[in-house]
């Protein structure tokens, strides 16, 4: 699936834009603040319902406007799909697919699997466990049809259980929540564990190509003690949870631990090496999805040249081309991306929110 056309209205500093896109590489070139990252963010928002630079909707809607509007056309092997997203200052969204309203953002996300690589993306490696849980859950969402419903129910039940912990005095009073919670926890943890095991070799192989000087290992931690049933953990930790007023163990505490030569990567790798590792993980995840489902990701890469020397940029470019996926790349100068260009690529110039090709 590739995005063949993108219409943007009142998004960030872009008043209006109508872009015909390449199914291969699309380059967005312009000075800092020109709006090139806003194009990437518009694509991301169309597939996620939210921007990646700010959660405050007022900062995403163009100044003095009431809403942004995004439309796109997706070309699959057999059919074309029209999609749209409108969001106003109150945060209310309207999702349209093939001319009909009433759809959910999750449907857009399923239609447009994306991998995002930005200068802020180091949080996958040096941020908290929630970023690595999101990495795992992205894959579970795209590979397991029941994941989104299970994950939504898990969040709801954990919120209810945590509220109940402020009121109950005996564990028996929590059993109604735990009876529903336990099978969801076991299913989600199983999906995460199976995915982690399945992609481990792919991640190791890709990382070896990008960072041959390190031995990288990946280990999934499910969020509670190994070999212990979750039901037992909940009951045994009731008093502690009640004092904390939240559930201290479970899949909401899971992590994917990444080590280089036995030490945490954030303590071992330079910024340039961390970016290479981030790129390797995103590529491995996208390639794994293609192999397992036949679906290809869209790759969004902001500030392509930052932190990478010529050799590493060339390696990343060759790996991206090998995916045969649609790729969007922003850069300050065309010189940074000219070697990646071919007869099927499109080069866009961005200046003060105006986009030309």
Curated annotation (Swiss-Prot):
GO biological process, one term: double-strand break repair
Pfam family, any one: SMC_N
Subcellular location: Cytoplasm
Gene3D superfamilies referenced in this protein's UniProt entry, alphabetically: P-loop containing nucleotide triphosphate hydrolases (3.40.50.300), RecF/RecN/SMC, N-terminal domain (1.20.1050.90)
Source organism per UniProt: Shigella boydii serotype 4 (strain Sb227)
Swiss-Prot/TrEMBL keywords: ATP-binding, Cytoplasm, DNA damage, DNA repair, DNA replication, DNA-binding, Nucleotide-binding, SOS response
Source species, domain of life: Bacteria
GO function term, MF aspect, one: single-stranded DNA binding
Protein name per UniProt: DNA replication and repair protein RecF
GO cellular component: cytoplasm
Family in the record: Belongs to the RecF family.
Function per UniProt: The RecF protein is involved in DNA metabolism; it is required for DNA replication and normal SOS inducibility. RecF binds preferentially to single-stranded, linear DNA. It also seems to bind ATP.
Residues the record lists as binding ATP: 30-37
């Amino acid at each position: 699936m590739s995005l063949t056309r993108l219409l943007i209205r009142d998004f960030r500093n872009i008043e209006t834009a109508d872009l015909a896109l390449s199914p291969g590489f699309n380059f967005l070139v312009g000075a800092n603040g020109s709006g090139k990252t806003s194009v990437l963010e518009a694509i991301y928002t169309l597939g996620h319902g939210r921007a990646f630079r700010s959660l405050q909707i007022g900062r995403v809607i163009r100044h003095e406007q009431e809403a942004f509007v995004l439309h796109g056309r997706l070309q699959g092997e057999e059919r074309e799909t029209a999609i749209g997203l409108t969001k106003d200052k109150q945060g209310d969204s309207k999702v349209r697919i093939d001319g009909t309203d009433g759809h959910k953002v999750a449907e857009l996300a399923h239609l447009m699997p994306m991998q995002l690589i930005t200068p802020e993306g180091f949080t996958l490696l040096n941020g908290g466990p929630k970023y690595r849980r999101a990495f795992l859950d992205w894959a579970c969402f795209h590979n397991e049809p029941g994941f989104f419903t299970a994950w939504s129910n898990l969040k709801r039940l954990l919120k209810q259980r945590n509220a109940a912990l402020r009121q109950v005095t005996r564990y028996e009073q929590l059993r109604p929540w735990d009876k529903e919670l336990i099978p969801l926890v076991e299913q989600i943890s199983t999906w995460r564990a199976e995915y982690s095991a399945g992609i481990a070799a792919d991640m190791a192989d890709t990382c070896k190509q990008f960072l041959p000087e390190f031995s990288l290992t990946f280990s999934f931690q499910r969020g509670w003690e190994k070999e212990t049933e979750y039901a037992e953990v909940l009951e045994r930790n009731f008093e502690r949870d009640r004092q904390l007023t939240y559930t201290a163990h479970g899949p909401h505490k899971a992590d994917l631990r990444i080590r280089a030569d036995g030490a945490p990567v954030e303590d071992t790798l330079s910024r340039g090496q961390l970016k290479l590792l981030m790129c390797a993980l995103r590529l491995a995840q996208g390639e794994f999805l293609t192999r397992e489902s036949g679906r290809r990701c869209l790759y969004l890469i902001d500030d392509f040249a930052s932190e990478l020397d010529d050799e590493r940029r060339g390696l990343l470019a060759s790996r991206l081309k090998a995916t045969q996926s649609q790729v969007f790349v922003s850069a300050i100068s065309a010189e940074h991306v000219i070697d990646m260009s071919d007869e099927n690529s499109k080069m866009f110039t961005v200046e003060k929110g105006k986009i030309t090709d």
